[in-house]
Amino acid sequence: MYLFFLIFLIFISFSLIFLILLQSGKGFNNTIHLNTSNNFNFFNSVGSGGFIKNIIGFFAGFFLIFSIILCNINDKKVNSDVFLEKNTQKKTINEKKEQKILNSELPL
């Protein structure tokens, strides 16, 4: 299950990067994007970037949700391992105490 969420998160992150880079530039440095407006007419014809912004919003939401899920799964794995380590340490300490008590008896 952890592997599924991890692969899906990687897919969402690459999709977000691709969609963000696909947007047409409207800022200060438009000289880089000379002919990109003609290449991506599908995204520009729907509206003033509304379609691609909605897709990016959905992918960003999925990214947030899946990263929280992965953090919770990873946290549960770490906490369960910590509890197992503490229990084994307690058992070894108790066994050592019992051995000391058994070995401390002197025959009369």
Curated annotation (Swiss-Prot):
GO molecular function per UniProt: protein-transporting ATPase activity
Residue intervals passing through the bilayer: 2-22, 51-71
One GO location term (cellular component): plasma membrane
Topology relative to the membrane: Multi-pass membrane protein
Pfam families: SecG
Ranges in coiled-coil conformation: none
Cellular compartment(s): Cell membrane
Keyword annotations from UniProtKB, A to Z: Cell membrane, Membrane, Protein transport, Translocation, Transmembrane, Transmembrane helix, Transport
GO biological process, one term: protein transport by the Sec complex
Main location: membrane
Keyword Signal appears in the UniProt entry: no
Oligomeric and partner information: Part of the prokaryotic protein translocation apparatus which comprise SecA, SecB, SecE, SecF, SecG and SecY.
The family this protein is said to belong to: Belongs to the SecG family.
Role description: Involved in protein export. Participates in an early event of protein translocation.
Name of the protein described by the UniProt record: Protein-export membrane protein SecG
Species this chain originates from: Buchnera aphidicola subsp. Schizaphis graminum (strain Sg)
Protein's gene: secG
